[in-house]
Amino acid sequence: MLKQVPDNIIISRTDSIGDVVLTLPVAAVLKQHFPGTKIGFMGRSYTRAVIEACPYVDTFIDVTDFMHEAVTVCGEKPAVILHELPVPAIAYRAKKLGIPQRIGTTNRSYHWLTCNRLVRLSRKNSQLHEAQLNLRLPEPLGIRTEWSLAEIGQLYGLKPAPLDPAFAALLQSEEHHPANPALRRPDRYNLILHPKSQGHGREWPLEHFIHLIRLLDLQRFRIFVSGTAKERDRLQPLFDAVGSLVTDITGMMDLAQFIAFIHAADGLVASGTGPLHIAAALGKDAYGLFPPIRPVHPGRWAPLGPRAQVFVLKDACNDCRKDPAGCSCMAGIEPLWLKAALEKAASGII
């Protein structure tokens, strides 16, 4: 138990966007418990925009700076560090910097050498969601560590940057609308499809995205296809098939603007990627496509938010463990299931 309130706390999570999003509730809980404590969040430069969208984080700390410079948290020497993602080099660096309280887990041998507060926590064998596991680590700070998924989904409060007017105009575009003015509706549901995952997870077949696009009524839906510039070539078969029905926004926006675009849209469909978790955290309709196999199942990685849903087969076959690209569990998720959910959501707008 803490003897005094810390001046500041560093949350260390230096992996991908989705992992970072699922760690942001830790900042919210720390701020609720210690309102006067400055919260620093350490990550990689490419996740900076999503970290800075969190109102409970006072400052972003680049892990490269942390490893090579004497960093501060809002001008103060670091007081506490939470190793949410265990990284040996970061743990040893935190000890070398003399951070007074260094919190890690008992199942990392190097944490016994580098941390002075240890939490009994094994992610590998846990039945908990990743966000619930993240909230277990601050236990030595004397705060509540058990949260339901519904409670966690209410903790985000993300504040996106203003959306560039040029991108905002896309959400009102009449492109791909019926030629007959009598059929045009200005209140179409703005849907983002994010087919790829930069190789970070199982993906729904591109053919299923194509089928879904053909199933949706353009009188009711305005469809955008997103992805990184590097993923554009891999998406070409989709654009060849249904490019006349969608707006291609791949590689058009930096992360800050993409977050703002998701916030301004109505819904997003993706596998367990960063954009899916961003959409859920923003309170948008977030439709996640998952395989039922551990450790990538929705029990661990489902998007959290008031309007998040997951689509997953009940039974796992495990045939794709050696060939994730040929995942029959993902292929078994029917486009018609997504169509039904999207039409139900759109009926609340149109």
Which residues does each predicted region cover?
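Catalytic machinery of carbohydrate-active enzymes
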Residues: M1-I350
